[in-house]
């Protein structure tokens, strides 16, 4: 078990501990539960779906990287597939506050990058900030997405974001978590191809500036992130943050990164290179390359 989970795990009910122990035994537990695992945990612990999600929130919050605020937020995105995806907030010292990943963004991008096609609900231990409410409004679940908070009745995103502005106001039909493939040809080595594949998945209907990042760890593991734009622009999630989020949720540290590649168009309206390189260098990675999409 990764050390970050030990305190939260010890506070769980005994029957839930017994069911979770073999799942968490892997140091690189992927911070997600399959639909089958969720069903097993519900039956073993005698909890319904909502109660189980609340019980597991401390494990999600344990994934937080909060060197600045020391305020850990955890979220669980429940996919329409039945799979559950952990998320937690991330802060990066030596960069800027704009590089921060919020817990809801973490869980949602986690689900998206693992191929989830839509979300039924998000469970979070603190009320979503306005930034996250706007981020969630880009999803194909729209304002019907259910939000669950401890000690409160469940509500929809519509309740948390009245008179919402979103992609439909801009006549955008393809939404975040809809399947997308921009068709850029895969070239280069495995890591380069992973970055291009991530760029092909980008949600960028406003700038038309696709980008993807691939991070290679010292043990050969590769994590990718795709660019996810938002109708309100500022809640947009850069591709590097998506990749760093997956890396961290899987129990790796920034020091494990040995190489990084950004794939983007050289003549795009928005360029990720400077911000990507600066953030990676602040985290200790200097082996950074860029491949231009054709």
From Swiss-Prot:
Among the Pfam families in the record, one is dCMP_cyt_deam_1
Q: Where does Zn(2+) bind?
A: 102, 129, 132
Q: Per the UniProt entry, what is one GO biological process?
A: cytidine deamination
Q: Which domain of life is it from?
A: Bacteria
Q: Which residues bind substrate?
A: 89-91
Cofactor details (free text):
Binds 1 zinc ion.
Query: Which SUPFAM superfamilies is this protein grouped with?
Result: Cytidine deaminase-like
Q: Kindly provide the name given to this protein in its UniProt entry.
A: Cytidine deaminase
Q: Which gene encodes it?
A: cdd
